[in-house]
Curated annotation (Swiss-Prot):
Keywords: Ribonucleoprotein, Ribosomal protein. It holds the Pfam family Ribosomal_L28. Gene3D superfamilies: Ribosomal protein L28/L24. The keyword Transmembrane does not apply. This is Large ribosomal subunit protein bL28. It comes from the Bacteria. GO terms for biological process: translation. The gene is rpmB. PANTHER family: 39S RIBOSOMAL PROTEIN L28, MITOCHONDRIAL, LARGE RIBOSOMAL SUBUNIT PROTEIN BL28M. It comes from Acinetobacter baumannii (strain AB0057). One of its GO terms (cellular component) is cytosolic large ribosomal subunit.
């Protein structure tokens, strides 16, 4: 499974580790992903999403019903 947030679309980015001597080695910055269950009142069931903490804040702001409707409009199976 890829490390992508279902709500925001955030994915890993590539950068450098930089030592005190300014030597650089490649590394990946991973998004802060969590599996989280949300109760959908309209369907009387839980949905499990893989999302970042930013995605959780978006759900707190807009509501899970609106976010799930937007994801389904994009073609994601939820």
């Amino acid at each position: 499974m890829s490390k992508v947030c279902q709500v925001t679309g955030k994915r890993p980015v590539v950068g450098n580790n930089v030592s005190h001597a300014n030597n650089k080695t490649k590394r990946r910055f991973e998004p802060n992903l969590h599996h989280h269950r949300f109760w959908l009142e309209s369907e009387k069931r839980f949905v499990r999403l893989r999302l970042t903490t930013k995605g959780m804040r978006i759900i707190d702001k807009l509501g899970i019903e609106k976010v799930v409707a937007d994801l389904r409009a994009q073609g994601q199976k939820i």
